[in-house]
């Protein structure tokens, strides 16, 4: 690539192009004027006086001499004052006649009628102090106005041409920036790294290419880390589940023997603990699978079918937890985009959390669905204690717990999973305490 230059210099180059073009345009106008005068298409501004020295001049002699001058004229007979010849416009005849009758020059504005005579003839010349077209048809257009219009149009074309090339060059550079920006972070090999003659754009392009490669490397490294994490959690789950399975079998064997009431309580407690552990590791596996999930999150989903399938599971859970469950649909939306499996699992996790912390004795949990121009909202509310400020800020984090309040009995894997699903759907998880009391979790996704 040739020599590079700054953006300021490129703009000044465009300005200089316009200035040089303007000077050339002026020279063109001067040359055009000189050429038209040479071929007799416009009259000059100088005043001439025709001399009729000889009384032997004929009309033909006068007409032959007048062909050398770009002026209108009329030849009068001195005896009869009749027009014997000439080159003129009928509308100017009264002025010619007035000059003949007065035997003097007369001036009307910028036009002078010059009187000359001998014994037989009188000649009146029409001369304009300003250049004008000698062609009677074109004379209605002022030559000065013609030059102004010519200069104005030429200047506009010149400016448009110069600005167009400037904008075109800038546009080409912006398109190069857009091209790399749209592929930022993708692992791709550019056939040829684009360069710019403008220093500022070239620096931006080089920086974007460099950052794109770095980002692609980091994304790929993170993807490998997620694969490793998924494998490690799966291996850990298998390693832990094996002794738990053995322990579960031993407990079942103990149940088959004769045990007293206290021993039966111990066995029941161990079974509950095993169930908690099993659920805990299953949730961990689900969370790591979500991190490593490459499934499509843009599938078209029927909202009605989705709610029907979801309600079946939520109603079963509400029966298990002895909760008064309500479904409230506040939208006319028919379809949306997302991943059915991930979304239903996230809502079930939130629903279970709401059931566990609803008000004892009269548990109420509701699921409300509504939307706006960009997002679809799934709002799950219960009538339990409100979230603490710490929980509202951190409940979506993995392994979050606090000593008191809503998170005192569990870890935040369920809500962390829901937060991950929301982010996959270009949304967010919102925890709030409404004015009507209780607590609510809103899963917001892009429609």
Swiss-Prot record:
EC number of the protein: 2.7.13.3
GO biological process, one term: cellular response to phosphate starvation
Assigned keywords, A-Z: ATP-binding, Cell membrane, Kinase, Membrane, Nucleotide-binding, Phosphoprotein, Transferase, Transmembrane, Transmembrane helix, Two-component regulatory system
CDD domains registered for this protein in UniProt: HATPase_SpaK_NisK-like, HisKA
GO cellular component, one term: plasma membrane
Catalytic activity: ATP + protein L-histidine = ADP + protein N-phospho-L-histidine
Residue intervals of the Histidine kinase domain: 235-447
Gene Ontology molecular function, alphabetical: ATP binding; phosphoprotein phosphatase activity; phosphorelay sensor kinase activity
Protein localization: Cell membrane
Modified residues (Phosphohistidine): 238
InterPro entries documented for this protein: 2-comp_sensor_kinase, HATPase_C_sf, His_kinase_dom, HisK_dim/P_dom, HisK_dim/P_sf, Sig_transdc_His_kin/Pase_MprB, SpaK_NisK-like_HATPase
Membrane disposition: Multi-pass membrane protein
Transmembrane intervals: 15-35, 147-167
Class of the enzyme per the UniProt entry, highest EC level: transferase
Predominant place of localization: membrane
Entries under PANTHER family matching the protein: PHOSPHATE REGULON SENSOR PROTEIN PHOR
Known role: Member of the two-component regulatory system NisK/NisR involved in the regulation of the biosynthesis of lantibiotic nisin. NisK may function as a membrane-associated protein kinase that phosphorylates NisR in response to environmental signals.
Protein name, as recorded: Nisin biosynthesis sensor protein NisK
Naturally occurring in which organism (per UniProt): Lactococcus lactis subsp. lactis
Originating gene: nisK
